[in-house]
């Protein structure tokens, strides 16, 4: 009798993806973040579903409905803070996952990489719209500032912004549609994640050496299932430490003040995971230029596979490229810090230099480093 796991139409898909999947024997903990992202997504959908049962997407009651969730709903506070801090964990895993892809040359799987970039954009859109829903000061002004950026688009800009707002300012219509989109997008992300996985399983996983590992594969279960469970336990540990001991560490105190269109907060800034892009946006004095730089700061990832000049796939044996990679990581941390600072000297010039460095490293310095390494190896 054949195993039902290998014959049943549905079980067969699960089996080939998570049980009998041939996996490189040497993939490190950097390969854990894919499964952690899946866990984050499931966690966000579940906590979000329970929050949506009590939330009202009306400007008059949105803020008080969130207060009601925290004060009156059974374990509402933990659901709310798991959702808010779950988003932070999601982005930490995302950045680690992308960093792994850049370091080990995983971007040469073109379809997988490009769907990953689309997933990043969709997740950023979802997180932005979710931040608007509590209808605090930073929710309102963040929504106003970020949607207003579209007015920089020539000719159609103003009409486009008013169309998104559903009126002449961020108001009831905006909040309602943001709630609708915030609810539907995670399911689109889940579908895209399945396509992401589908394309990955066409080629098989990369590994730290960047050398094809067809001659040395092991089954995913039990080796990597147990490894993923360890990763998941660590993820949940960090998340629960945040939720139970410092739930507001990564939030903005301004969001505990109800939205007031007549009172602008002194420093409008998004959540920490958008600060690097926000710093790039602010570092260009021209509005349209800033918006283009903001969009390109993410879309530049689609160019990375075409800028790969090295004869080796991974950076494991390329010290100069490794140096460039870690300079890029430090530059992104600098941009994140600058994004949270007021627009004044010396932060302006630091932000401008860090923004130039960001594009310079990816577009010029990394390909140049690869070429130098090729020549040093006489390839």
Curated annotation (Swiss-Prot):
GO cellular component term of the entry, any: respiratory chain complex III
InterPro entries: Cyt_b/b6_C, Cyt_b/b6_C_sf, Cyt_b/b6_N, Cytb/b6-like_sf, Cytochrome_b, Cytochrome_b_C_euk/bac, Cytochrome_b_N_euk/bac, Di-haem_cyt_TM
Location(s), subcellular: Mitochondrion inner membrane
GO MF, one example: metal ion binding
Quaternary assembly: The cytochrome bc1 complex contains 11 subunits: 3 respiratory subunits (MT-CYB, CYC1 and UQCRFS1), 2 core proteins (UQCRC1 and UQCRC2) and 6 low-molecular weight proteins (UQCRH/QCR6, UQCRB/QCR7, UQCRQ/QCR8, UQCR10/QCR9, UQCR11/QCR10 and a cleavage product of UQCRFS1). This cytochrome bc1 complex then forms a dimer.
Miscellaneous section: Heme 1 (or BL or b562) is low-potential and absorbs at about 562 nm, and heme 2 (or BH or b566) is high-potential and absorbs at about 566 nm.
Reported function: Component of the ubiquinol-cytochrome c reductase complex (complex III or cytochrome b-c1 complex) that is part of the mitochondrial respiratory chain. The b-c1 complex mediates electron transfer from ubiquinol to cytochrome c. Contributes to the generation of a proton gradient across the mitochondrial membrane that is then used for ATP synthesis.
UniProt-recorded name of the protein: Cytochrome b
